[in-house]
Curated annotation (Swiss-Prot):
Residues 1-36 form a transit peptide. It comes from Cucumis sativus. InterPro entries: L-lactate/malate_DH, Lactate/malate_DH_C, Lactate/malate_DH_N, Lactate_DH/Glyco_Ohase_4_C, Malate_DH_AS, Malate_DH_type1, NAD(P)-bd_dom_sf. The active site is at residue 220. It catalyses: (S)-malate + NAD(+) = oxaloacetate + NADH + H(+). NCBIfam families: MDH_euk_gproteo. Homodimer. This is Malate dehydrogenase, glyoxysomal. NAD(+) binds at residues 51-57, 77, 137, 160-162, 271. It is an enzyme of class 1 (oxidoreductase). It is found in: Glyoxysome. Keywords: Glyoxylate bypass, Glyoxysome, NAD, Oxidoreductase, Peroxisome, Transit peptide, Tricarboxylic acid cycle. Substrate binds at residues 124, 130, 162, 196.
Length: 356
């Protein structure tokens, strides 16, 4: 017969498994560190996702947890962060996951981060104009960037929150006010335009999308999205009908998804995929890998506009080089002028939001 204390201890252990305590955000971590033998995952980079419980944030967080370059993954949101954190933390990959809930935990979420990815904000819905989107998301981006300026001013920032053509200038102005602005470290994520372009062009050419690369320049909305089909790799020729079709579909890919979801959301899954693809490129650049080149909306002197999406080479300091547009055909030159006209107003709108 077992001693009474041993029996009681055994019952307590079984009861703890059958009735686990309600999950709480303790010390901004899934587990108290004192209860864990391991203090961290494999060597790698510290990444924060701001807006991790949203439609983009959740699949983005899951995919980032799978990235072997990530050692610590901080998930921040104003709602539902505990549940997302608990769920993703059960994945048997190297990154240690910690969750942060609400404005009061933003600073802890950001401290010491190497890369900050921002999908926070409201999604686009049918009938919603870019102005509607701007009014809500501009304030969110401002608040989050103020936290970055204070807690991790040297982090690379990947900004997804729309409208990117305006939110990137907002972020730049916030960082300038704080005295922490480094144009090499602020990148608007336009990778979804490239991903769509690769997919749609591959369909027309009958190729595997993974073997296709289409530079997409300009901005990240409507006519500001300019696919350079004359520079497609592998080199390809298109009829004018194909050029018109591809350009229109790439520019309106977001609307295609919004309408297909019929009010149930926007492009969340493909956006998360594109965001992780771009974040991985940034991490490979930070690691020192050579030849990491992607398109992004960045501070630029390629045109007369202060921001523009072009190919950039990524390195240990963020952007190592911003590439020129290269040779354009007549169709692309006309598209470029349309893009610049639209883009100028969007950039000014973002700047004015901070400067007043």
């Amino acid at each position: 017969m077992q001693p009474i204390p041993d029996v009681n201890q055994r019952i307590a252990r079984i009861s703890a498994h059958l009735h686990p305590p309600k999950y709480q955000m303790e010390e901004s971590s899934v587990l108290r560190r004192a209860n864990c033998r391991a203090k961290g995952g494999a060597p790698g980079f510290k990444v924060a996702i701001l807006g991790a419980a949203g439609g983009i944030g959740q699949p983005l967080a899951m995919l980032m947890k799978m990235n072997p370059l990530v050692s610590v993954l901080h998930l921040y949101d104003v709602v539902n962060a505990p549940g997302v954190t608990a769920d993703i933390s059960h994945m048997d990959t190297g990154a240690v996951v910690r969750g942060f809930l609400g404005q009061q935990q933003l600073e802890r979420a950001l401290t010491g981060m190497d890369l900050v990815v921002i999908p926070a904000g409201v999604p686009r819905k049918p009938g919603m104009t870019r102005d509607d989107l701007f009014k809500i998301n501009a304030g969110i981006v401002k608040t989050l960037c103020e936290g970055i300026a204070k807690c991790c001013p040297t982090a690379i920032v990947n900004l997804i929150s729309n409208p990117v053509n305006s939110t990137v200038p907002i972020a730049a102005e916030v960082f300038k006010k704080a005295g922490t602005y480094d144009p090499k470290r602020l990148l608007g994520v336009t990778m979804l335009d490239v991903v769509r372009a690769n997919t749609f062009v591959a369909e027309v050419l009958g190729l595997d999308p993974r073997d296709v690369n289409v530079p997409v320049v300009g901005g990240h909305a409507g006519v500001t999205i300019l696919p350079l089909l004359s520079q497609v790799k592998p080199p390809s020729s298109f009829t004018q009908e194909e050029i018109n079709y591809l350009t229109d579909r790439i520019q309106n890919g977001g609307t295609e998804v919004v309408e297909a979801k019929a009010g149930a959301g926007s492009a969340t899954l493909s956006m998360a995929y594109a965001a992780v693809k771009f974040a991985d490129a940034c991490l490979r650049g930070l690691r020192g890998d050579a030849g990491v080149v992607e398109c992004a909306f960045v501070s630029s002197q390629v045109t007369e506009l202060p921001f523009f999406a072009t190919k950039v080479r990524l390195g240990r300091n963020g952007i190592d080089e911003v590439y020129s547009l290269g040779p354009l055909n007549e169709y692309e030159r006309i598209g470029l002028e349309k893009a610049k006209k639209e883009l100028a107003g969007s950039i000014e709108k973002g700047v004015s939001f901070i400067r007043g």
